[in-house]
């Protein structure tokens, strides 16, 4: 089964509400939808970045250029079922650009799994679970609004784990915000925070213990991504778990963080690792080092979220669950099928491949004008 064509489309999908982070406020998400055609079948994938190149080194525009001009010409005519060969060829031809590679890798996995009438989870080893506890992100910037949102989520049994974005205000203001939320949800929910690199080491060393005292269970990426030493010291000094996100940008970074046990948990993201196989490798590094895996998100659409669900469903352990909330943050979906959240968990989609199919009318509607 030879690859006949690889096409890319940039779509811009508005969010239901602004998402305030330490570095930007997200009003829309841009994705590159990839379709790989072979043997009468089409596999779909997705690449993107939260807030564009502000968060990382890629954007929808660079992803499309890299695929159209370098990766697609390289892979057309190759065996669509040889996932290892495709991955090696992409890595040899293009340095970095992991989200672009991930989009193709996901599409090839979807294509092969559909051809074999398997789910991607079954293709890569089989499921350890068919649903995953899912955290909701509270990022309106308004304490009362965030509390109302959390209480509604608990009442409707959608979420009982909440991640609060910090770093846009002073640490003292953030702490009061957290205390109010923790008090409001009580023992009905857990609270974690994401600083998105917003603090230096000194600030983090002062405020993380106070967050722990307030009842926070996990602190995500408190310091800049390159400061592995600060992460290690903060992990050693504090009882609350430290989670690496932006620092986890490659298999080699996973090795360095694991070697020094610089963090307690890894936030896995397919786009950060270059695809499914590399994400599984990072999870294996974490397991070997006694570091927990966490199901991270790039605010993926239903396509990327389904792919992540298939990967996370195969992992031995996910003690902190996942945060695959992209489809519910967006104002619309790009697939014919919805994903399901029930009893505080997101459920693995049924069917072959990803278990979701593109809604081509929606894709056309959100396609960026040339």
Curated annotation (Swiss-Prot):
One of its GO terms (molecular function) is manganese ion binding. Signal peptide: none annotated. Its EC number is 5.5.1.7. GO terms for biological process: 2,4-dichlorophenoxyacetic acid catabolic process; amino acid catabolic process. It catalyses: 2-[(2R)-2-chloro-2,5-dihydro-5-oxofuryl]acetate = 3-chloro-cis,cis-muconate + H(+). Its cofactor is Mn(2+). InterPro entries: Chloromuconate_cycloisomerase (IPR013370), Enolase-like_C_sf (IPR036849), Enolase-like_N (IPR029017), Enolase_C-like (IPR029065), Mandel_Rmase/mucon_lact_enz_CS (IPR018110), Mandelate_racemase_C (IPR013342), Mandelate_racemase_N_dom (IPR013341). It is an enzyme of class 5 (isomerase). Mn(2+) binds at residues 194, 220, 245. The active site is at residues 165, 323. Keywords: Aromatic hydrocarbons catabolism, Isomerase, Manganese, Metal-binding, Plasmid. Pathway: Aromatic compound metabolism; 3-chlorocatechol degradation. Gene3D superfamilies: Enolase-like C-terminal domain, Enolase-like, N-terminal domain. Pfam families: MR_MLE_C (PF13378), MR_MLE_N (PF02746). Belongs to the mandelate racemase/muconate lactonizing enzyme family. Chloromuconate cycloisomerase II is highly active toward chlorinated substrates but retains diminished activity toward the non-chlorinated substrates. This is Chloromuconate cycloisomerase. It comes from Pseudomonas sp. (strain P51). The gene is tcbD.
């Amino acid at each position: 089964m030879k690859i006949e064509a690889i096409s890319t489309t940039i779509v811009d999908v508005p969010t239901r509400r602004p998402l305030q982070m330490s570095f930007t406020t997200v009003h829309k998400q841009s994705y590159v939808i990839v379709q790989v055609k072979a043997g009468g079948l089409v596999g779909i994938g997705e690449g993107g970045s939260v807030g564009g190149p502000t968060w990382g080194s890629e954007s929808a525009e660079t992803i499309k250029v890299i695929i159209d001009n370098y990766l697609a010409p390289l892979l057309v005519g190759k065996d669509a079922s040889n996932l290892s060969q495709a991955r090696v060829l992409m890595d040899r031809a293009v340095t970095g650009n992991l989200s672009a590679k991930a989009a193709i890798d996901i599409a090839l996995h979807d294509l092969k799994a559909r051809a074999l009438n398997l789910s991607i989870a079954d293709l890569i080893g089989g499921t350890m679970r068919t649903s995953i506890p899912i955290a909701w992100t509270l990022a309106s910037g308004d304490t009362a609004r965030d509390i109302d949102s959390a209480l509604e989520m608990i009442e409707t049994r959608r979420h009982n784990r909440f991640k609060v974005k910090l770093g846009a205000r002073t640490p003292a203001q953030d702490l009061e915000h957290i205390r109010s939320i923790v008090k409001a949800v009580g023992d009905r929910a857990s609270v974690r925070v994401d600083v998105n690199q917003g603090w230096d080491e000194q600030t983090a060393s002062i405020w993380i213990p106070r967050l722990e005292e307030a009842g926070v269970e996990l602190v995500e990426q408190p310091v800049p991504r390159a400061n592995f030493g600060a992460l290690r010291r903060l992990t050693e000094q504090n009882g609350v778990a430290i989670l690496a996100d932006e620092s986890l940008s490659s298999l080699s970074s996973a090795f360095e963080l694991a070697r020094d046990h610089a963090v307690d948990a890894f936030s896995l993201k397919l786009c950060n690792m270059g695809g499914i196989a590399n994400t599984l490798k990072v999870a294996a590094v974490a397991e070997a080092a006694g570091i927990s895996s966490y199901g991270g998100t790039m605010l993926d659409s239903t396509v990327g979220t389904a792919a992540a669900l298939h990967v996370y469903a195969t992992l031995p352990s996910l003690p902190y669950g996942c945060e695959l909330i992209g489809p519910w943050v967006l104002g619309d979906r790009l697939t014919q099928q919805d994903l399901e959240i029930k009893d505080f968990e997101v459920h693995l989609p049924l069917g072959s491949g990803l278990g979701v199919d593109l809604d081509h009318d929606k894709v056309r509607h959100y396609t960026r004008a040339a």
